């Protein structure tokens, strides 16, 4: 199953994240290596959030990520939520089209 982790972020997020960016990316590395974190990045125009795509049996993988993400711990993320995403089109889709 796929899960989307949505982050709401502080104003000037792109500038304010710089001191913590390396820690955030290093924190993400094991999730990527295990195949749990598929894609992620900031939204653009305006940069008012970020979205990360996870693969797992439950939404706990995305919740676990958010709970200890340096961006969350340092107050750059003002709120987050996880939503299940039923994927049906494209490589890696969870539900195949007939």
Where are these regions (language model features)?
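Conserved, structured core segments of small domains
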Residues: 1-98
